[in-house]
Amino acid sequence: MRNITTTTRKMLLLVITILLGIAYHGEAIACPQVNMYLAQCLPYLKAGGNPSPMCCNGLNSLKAAAPEKADRQVACNCLKSVANTIPGINDDFAKQLPAKCGVNIGVPFSKTVDCNSIN
C-alpha cells in the first residue's frame, strides 16, 4: 500500500511540475489581456491631453506581460486591430502615448505598423 502512495505522490509531483512549466512557458499574450491593460487609455487616445495614471499603469503592465518578440508582435496586432475598429482613436495621440507615460514597450502605436517587423 505504501508503494502505491509513494508512486501516486511522485506522479502528482511530476504532473504539477509539467503544469508549472507549461504555465511559465505559456502562449503569447492574448488580445483580451492587451485590451484590458489599455482600456483606461481610450479617453486619451480619442481626445489627447495627458493619459491618466491608470492608463500608464496599464502600459507598464503590458510591457511586463510582453517580454518576448512573439508577445510584442501579438500585442502589436491587437493594438492595431483595436485602433482600426474603435472609431475616434487618433493615430498621433496613439504614437505619443508611450513617451507621455515614459514607458517604451517596444511596440509602436499605429494603425499602419507592420507588426512582423517588431523585434
UniProtKB/Swiss-Prot annotation:
Q: List the signal peptide residues.
A: 1-28
Tell me the protein's name. Answer: Non-specific lipid-transfer protein 11
Q: Has keyword Disulfide bond? A: yes
- Give yes or no: UniProt keyword Transport: yes
Gene Ontology MF terms in the entry? lipid binding
Cysteines joined through disulfide linkages = 31-78, 41-55, 56-101, 76-115
The Gene Ontology biological process terms listed for this entry are:
lipid transport
Q: Which UniProt keywords apply?
A: Disulfide bond, Lipid-binding, Signal, Transport
| SUPFAM superfamilies for this protein | Bifunctional inhibitor/lipid-transfer protein/seed storage 2S albumin (SSF47699)
Gene3D superfamilies according to UniProt: Plant lipid-transfer and hydrophobic proteins (1.10.110.10)
Q: Out of the domains of life, which is the source?
A: Eukaryota
Q: Which Pfam families match?
A: Tryp_alpha_amyl
- What's its job? Plant non-specific lipid-transfer proteins transfer phospholipids as well as galactolipids across membranes. May play a role in wax or cutin deposition in the cell walls of expanding epidermal cells and certain secretory tissues.
The similarity comment for this entry is:
Belongs to the plant LTP family.
